[in-house]
């Protein structure tokens, strides 16, 4: 031990193998490789949009989601090799979870690694993401007892409030000086798409007031078949968020398709129910800070996630969650609604999220932990078309035992004993999914007025249609498996029974051979494992007369196999139908061919 003034500090003891600075360099190099590939995927998205390669865009979006874990595993393997034979290597190699505590020398070594890593981030453009990568690699090495700020970045070490790219993250236009029309044309042309515009002067017509300043993020936001310009108008001190949607027409030209105005329009664009954007960002913190000024209600954790930086979103969510726990006193309790057969769900009333644990014993044939986790990963990798809630997945989450309601703790002990560990004043959850809390649709319909019920039932049917068109069959379509968002959108959130449409066989019920068969509780026809009979849906879904009338007005065709068979055939042919996150009244030229069944 060394004393510096009156402060006692531990110097890492000399060990065989790499020094702490070497380890810090290795981890940062792993992150830099990851982020270079991340940016390259956004640059590829631009060329895919220009060429209209929508299947390539979907494939790229799926592949990018897995980049991070691949780079973390790669870096942890390199680190394990570098530390082989070193005193700093933990007792069981690349993982210390379940191993003995670190020695004093190992403790000093790993603390020094973090200190050296902080020094390397002084001029880095993605320091917050690099810190998260450091955490991910370290969590593969250290026991959870060391998951605190001495070893990990539980709190950020580098401030990003005023961090920006070498080339500023947004451009500014002054329509008072050069005219609104010219400013708008230049704003769009500056993105440098290598494909002609259909009629840019027409599209950029005088739709806006002229006495304003326009600030636009310097990169396009690509998702599926669309690209978006995101910015803000500042006029006499008031900020007006906006986004411009770009689409390719059948001739291969780019059109300005829609103008989205205000926080509700942009909140829908950046909804947690949609696929992540592909955006080229040198400095993601600058982009997120800009977006936060447009969407003050949306947590930065969600913004990072929607930009494809879902691990950084997880880090920020966890920090926000710990901060909320410190400044609240209510207890975790069983979530309201009908109990599920697969998940044990609880909530913290003061926090707008639910916590979902897979039950130890699942009372469904062919269903186990691995199957459920595969289904959730399937949703993570899939285009959620605005109809499936995104989730955050966590392991080894330590929560204060005093914050658990007694009935919840008893339920966890009974239903998920393998996923919890009670350790003194702490309850450790070994695996949990966290997602946005929504009003369950069954509860919403029970109390809704006739006009609101009509809208909700129409939304419910639209959700089923759009999921099917995106090659997702919900499986269990009961109302309890759907939720209603703040903006009244119906979203599916129970994934254990989802299947791909192309795996299903939609059939008509054959005529009964006789009256006895028709009255029997057993089917008189053979049923395969993936057979679905849409004629049966009404029996389970339409018991409420109000719901039945509304459903038949808007979605009667969903009760017959023909619609499902036609949809399955289109999906099997590889057709991509886009459901844009805006209504037709946001379109600049409503007379043009509308995007398929857009939704606000």
UniProtKB/Swiss-Prot annotation:
It is found in: Cytoplasm. GO terms for cellular component: cytoplasm. Its EC number is 2.7.11.5, 3.1.3.-. One of its GO terms (biological process) is glyoxylate cycle. The active site is at 390. It comes from the Bacteria. It holds the Pfam family AceK_kinase. GO terms for molecular function: [isocitrate dehydrogenase (NADP+)] kinase activity; AMP binding; ATP binding; phosphoprotein phosphatase activity; protein serine/threonine kinase activity. ATP binds at residues 335-341, 356. It catalyses: L-seryl-[isocitrate dehydrogenase] + ATP = O-phospho-L-seryl-[isocitrate dehydrogenase] + ADP + H(+). Keywords: ATP-binding, Cytoplasm, Glyoxylate bypass, Hydrolase, Kinase, Nucleotide-binding, Protein phosphatase, Serine/threonine-protein kinase, Transferase, Tricarboxylic acid cycle. The keyword GTP-binding does not apply. Bifunctional enzyme which can phosphorylate or dephosphorylate isocitrate dehydrogenase (IDH) on a specific serine residue. This is a regulatory mechanism which enables bacteria to bypass the Krebs cycle via the glyoxylate shunt in response to the source of carbon. When bacteria are grown on glucose, IDH is fully active and unphosphorylated, but when grown on acetate or ethanol, the activity of IDH declines drastically concomitant with its phosphorylation. Belongs to the AceK family. This is Isocitrate dehydrogenase kinase/phosphatase. It comes from Bordetella parapertussis (strain 12822 / ATCC BAA-587 / NCTC 13253).
């Amino acid at each position: 031990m060394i004393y510096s003034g009156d402060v006692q500090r531990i110097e890492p003891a000399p060990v065989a193998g790499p020094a702490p600075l070497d380890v810090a360099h290795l981890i940062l190099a792993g992150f830099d490789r990851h982020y270079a590939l991340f940016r390259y995927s956004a640059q590829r998205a631009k060329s895919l949009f220009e060429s209209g390669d929508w299947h390539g865009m979907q494939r790229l979006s799926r592949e990018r989601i897995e980049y991070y874990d691949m780079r973390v595993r790669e870096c942890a393997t390199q680190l394990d090799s570098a530390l082989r034979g070193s005193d700093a290597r933990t007792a069981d190699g690349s993982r210390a979870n379940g191993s003995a505590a670190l020695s004093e020398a190992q403790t000093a070594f790993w603390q020094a690694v973090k200190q050296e890593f902080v020094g390397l981030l002084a001029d880095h453009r993605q320091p917050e993401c690099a810190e998260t990568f450091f955490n991910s690699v370290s969590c593969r090495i250290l026991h959870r007892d060391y998951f605190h700020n001495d070893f990990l970045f539980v709190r950020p070490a580098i401030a990003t409030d005023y961090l920006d790219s070498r080339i500023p993250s947004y451009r500014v236009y002054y329509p008072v000086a050069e005219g609104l029309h010219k400013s708008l044309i230049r704003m769009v042309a500056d993105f440098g798409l290598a494909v002609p515009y259909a009629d840019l002067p027409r599209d950029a017509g005088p739709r806006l007031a002229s006495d304003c300043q326009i600030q636009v993020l310097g990169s396009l936001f690509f998702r599926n078949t669309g690209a978006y310009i995101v910015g803000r108008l500042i006029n006499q001190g008031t900020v007006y968020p906006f986004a411009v949607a770009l689409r390719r027409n059948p001739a291969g030209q780019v059109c300005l398709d829609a103008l989205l105005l205000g926080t509700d329009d942009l909140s829908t664009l950046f909804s947690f129910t949609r696929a992540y954007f592909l955006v080229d960002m040198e400095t993601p913190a600058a982009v997120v800070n800009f977006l936060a000024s447009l969407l003050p209600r949306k947590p930065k954790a969600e913004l990072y996630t929607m930009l494809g930086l879902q691990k950084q979103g997880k880090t920020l969510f966890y920090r926000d969650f710990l901060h909320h726990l410190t400044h609240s006193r209510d207890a975790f309790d069983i979530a309201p609604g009908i109990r599920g057969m697969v998940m044990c769900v609880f909530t913290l009333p003061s926090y707008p999220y639910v916590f979902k644990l897979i039950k130890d014993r699942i009372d469904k044939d062919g269903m186990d932990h691995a199957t459920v986790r595969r289904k959730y990963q399937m949703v993570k990798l899939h285009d959620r078309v605005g109809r499936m809630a995104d989730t955050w997945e966590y392991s080894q989450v330590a929560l204060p035992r005093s914050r658990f309601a007694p009935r919840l703790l008893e339920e966890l002990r009974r239903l998920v004993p393998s996923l919890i560990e009670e350790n003194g004043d702490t309850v450790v959850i070994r695996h949990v999914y966290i997602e946005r809390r929504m009003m369950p649709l069954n509860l919403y319909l029970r109390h809704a007025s006739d006009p609101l019920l009509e809208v909700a039932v129409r939304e419910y049917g639209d959700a089923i249609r759009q999921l099917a068109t995106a090659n997702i069959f919900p499986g269990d379509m009961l109302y309890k498996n759907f939720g209603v968002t703040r903006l009244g959108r119906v979203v599916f959130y129970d994934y254990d029974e989802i299947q791909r449409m192309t795996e299903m066989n939609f059939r008509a019920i054959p005529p009964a051979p006789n009256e006895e068969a028709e009255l029997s509780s057993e089917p008189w026809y053979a049923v395969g494992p993936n057979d679905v009979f849409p004629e049966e849906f009404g029996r389970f879904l339409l018991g409420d007369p109000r719901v039945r009338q509304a459903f038949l007005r808007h979605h009667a065709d969903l009760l017959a196999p023909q619609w499902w068979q036609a949809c399955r055939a289109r999906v099997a042919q590889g057709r991509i139908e886009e459901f844009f996150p805006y209504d037709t009244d946001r379109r600049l030229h409503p007379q043009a061919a509308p995007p398929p069944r857009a939704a606000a």
